[in-house]
Amino acid sequence: RRLPLESGYFEAYNRPNVRLIDVLENPIERITPKGVQTTVEEHELDILVYATGFDGVTGGYDLIDIQGLGGRRLKDDWKDDLPKTFLGVLNDGFPNLLMVLGPHTSRGNIPRHIEKIVDFNVALIRHMREQGYSRVEARSEEAAKWLAQVVEVNKNRLAGKIPSWQTGVNANVPGRQNIRVLGYYGGATRYREIAEQVADGGYKELMFR
């Protein structure tokens, strides 16, 4: 296990409103509209952050039965070789699902990249609150455009032809033997510029309600 090296972790953990729940003793039964129901009680939450183990890029999402509009399942949308997202952060048809390191985000210094994605998501949530919106999702056509960019910059990349967790190959998972395009390799700097342009332009690529 990696030690928490950031400042403030233990201080945050020891706050009076923080509880450690042993899910081996009190297994999670289901996710509810208010939070998480274990075998013992329901824990009401404002935000739920998933940590589901390591199965590169899409595995953590596949393990959860994430359903969008009309009962669409995210893992069904992503079962082909080209999962579609917008910036690797949002999907069309799955309102308010803001991802960190989803398919087609940039690759590079991962902790730094996570920080930038979280900044993007926080700014988006702040924008929604200021404008009185309660729901956001990617426009389908914008997700398709982003996928086209991702595929284009990956065409001549040698590493994209090698079976590894970064290309979606996992020998331990049935049906996960095909190479897939799962990352944006146009550069972390360029990715951040694109994300900033989206924010500065008022998030025209997204649909709000």
Label every model-predicted segment.
Residues D55-P103, I114:
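Glycine-rich loop(s) and the adjacent beta-strand/alpha-helix scaffold that form part
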Residues K84-T85, N96-R209:
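C-terminal, flexible cofactor-proximal segment of oxidoreductases
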Residues Q37-I47, A51:
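Core beta-strand elements of the Rossmann-like FAD/NAD(P) dinucleotide-binding domain
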Residues V49, G53, D119-F120:
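C-terminal, active-site-flanking charged/polar segments
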Residues R19-I21, V49, P95-L98:
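Hydrophobic/aromatic beta-strand patches that form the interior of the parallel beta-sheet core
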Residues R1-G8:
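Short beta-strand to alpha-helix junction loop
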Residues R1, P27-R30, G56-T58, S106-G108:
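Flexible loop/turn segments at secondary-structure boundaries
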Residues A12, P16-T39:
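A conserved short coil-to-beta-strand element within the FAD-binding core of flavoproteins
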